[in-house]
């Protein structure tokens, strides 16, 4: 029940469903963030200070929702003309409403436009929910079990060249990697503009972690990891053991604590992102969940309990 509808609904099988599933999940996140922003605008009124805090979040979220929705529709239509069936018509309505919403975010903020944005959100949610009762054209095309489960045909027998060469990319991990590198770069640049230094080793560790992710999610290793357990475990353990260690060495929380501004520094009557970060770090459940004892329990459970019991 906690999974986004696009992940559990009409894009779960078929050719290229791996692209569509990742895109649908990203679109759901973007839609959620942007919808929350426009809802706050409506409930609290279009105040300049509030608008300045929310407008770019809303613009980016709505744009991500539109881009993800286009890929979902492309996959579901299975090369048929858009609008040639009821599912396609529903998807066009969703895309048009989202596109209008994107345009609205770039117009001068008024209460009427905020309400119009809420209306577009309502249309998207209602039509998306209703369209899950319809059958996408992709479902009507006969496909092999491999295509239905993986989103692509089984590749030939693996060789070193195939495994290490560029392969089928993973949109989700690529997006996370780009956001991680760009966000870190912006934070470091902000710090240096203030005349403060930041460790080159931290920068190298952080970028190195995401480079590993991009490489693993873009080569033949990723394709074979979805179909063969041995390659799956190689990719899985690299993700779980090497990447987190490099990310931690990048000291992202320390960087955020130094870069983010407090409410007093912004002086617009709201809590600043630094205040929110510190409140989260000092929250007792956070200290417990991210403490060494909880980390040890999770580590033991994730390996020994799963692999050495009937759960596996």
Model-derived segments and spans:
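Alpha-helical membrane segments of multi-pass proteins
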Residues: 1-312
């Amino acid at each position: 029940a906690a999974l986004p509808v696009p992940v559990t609904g009409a894009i779960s099988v078929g050719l290229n469903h791996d692209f569509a599933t990742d895109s649908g999940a990203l679109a759901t996140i973007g839609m959620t963030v942007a919808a929350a922003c426009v809802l706050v605008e409506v409930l609290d009124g279009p105040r300049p200070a509030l608008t300045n805090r929310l407008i770019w979040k809303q613009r980016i979220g709505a744009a991500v929702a539109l881009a993800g929705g286009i890929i979902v529709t492309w996959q579901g239509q299975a090369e048929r003309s858009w609008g040639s069936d009821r599912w396609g018509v529903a998807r066009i309505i969703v895309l048009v409403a989202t596109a209008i919403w994107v345009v609205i975010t770039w117009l001068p903020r008024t209460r009427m436009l905020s309400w119009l944005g809420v209306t577009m959100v309502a249309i998207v949610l209602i039509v998306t929910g209703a369209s899950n009762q319809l059958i996408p054209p992709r479902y009507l095309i006969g496909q092999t079990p491999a295509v239905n489960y993986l989103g692509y045909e089984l590749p030939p027998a693996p060789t070193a060249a195939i495994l290490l060469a560029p392969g089928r990319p993973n949109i989700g991990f690529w997006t996370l990697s780009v956001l991680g590198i760009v966000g870190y770069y912006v934070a470091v640049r902000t710090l240096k503009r203030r005349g403060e230094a930041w460790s080159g080793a931290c920068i190298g560790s952080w970028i190195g972690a995401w480079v590993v992710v991009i490489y693993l999610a873009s080569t033949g290793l990723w394709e074979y990891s979805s179909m063969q357990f041995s390659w799956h475990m190689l990719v899985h353990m690299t993700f779980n053991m090497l990447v987190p260690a490099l990310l931690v060495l990048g000291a992202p929380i320390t960087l955020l604590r130094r870069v983010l501004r407090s409410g007093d520094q912004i002086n617009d009557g709201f809590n600043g992102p630094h205040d929110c970060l510190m409140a989260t770090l000092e929250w007792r459940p956070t200290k417990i969940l991210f403490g060494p004892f909880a980390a040890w329990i999770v580590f033991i459970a994730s390996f020994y309990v799963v692999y050495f019991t009937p759960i596996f």
